Amino acid sequence: VKVSGEDPIVSTTGKASRELFEVRVANGQSHKYDFLTVGSMGHASMIAYGLSEQLHQGKIVCVDGDGAVLMHMGTLAFLGKQQPKHYLHIVLNNAAHESVGGMPTGAAGQSYAAIAKACGYPKVFQVDNASSFVSVLQNAQAYSELTMIEVMVKLGARDDLGRPKETPQENKERFMNYWEEHTK
């Protein structure tokens, strides 16, 4: 979130959105920049695409899970064809559906970065540690083309991971107010 600044983040359902919410709290940042895709696994990438079509500067950051991408794999081909210029797609790959019990996705060993490249993403990266992720993420802010960063992560979340303190309706309204100002 430090690298994204005031750029909007659309995050997938489940623990990724919960982590994002808690990071904003820990950093004393507003939640207005974030659209938490609660209860809509696989739809964050297309919501982010729709927003990217209205954006003239900055980035749309989509934080997705490997299971969510797998559920709507055709989105990668669609995005590769459309080539949104302001779109940064981050895929957290733990080879499992973490938020619904950690069941394996059945796609362990598959490279989402390679799949995205085959679908037409001009820039793709796969990282497996925090320092590489930060470096690639900082560089990606300067790219004016569709970019994917696949982040290989371990299965497991903190036991004390909280939940957003606002309702999905409140999140949507706050984000829409921010978006209206951001795209003027």
Regions found by a protein language model. Name each.
Residues V1-P8:
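Active-site pocket-lining segments that scaffold enzyme catalytic pockets across diverse folds
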Residues R18-N94:
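Thiamine diphosphate
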Residues P8-T13, L36-T37, C62, F125-D128, ...:
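General beta-strand structural signal in soluble alpha/beta enzymes
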Residues M103-N139:
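Conserved thiamine diphosphate
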Residues L20-R24, M73, V100-P104, D159-P164:
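Short acidic, glycine/serine/threonine-rich loops at helix termini
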Residues A16, G42-H43, N129-F133:
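Short acidic loop-to-helix transition motifs that present clustered carboxylates
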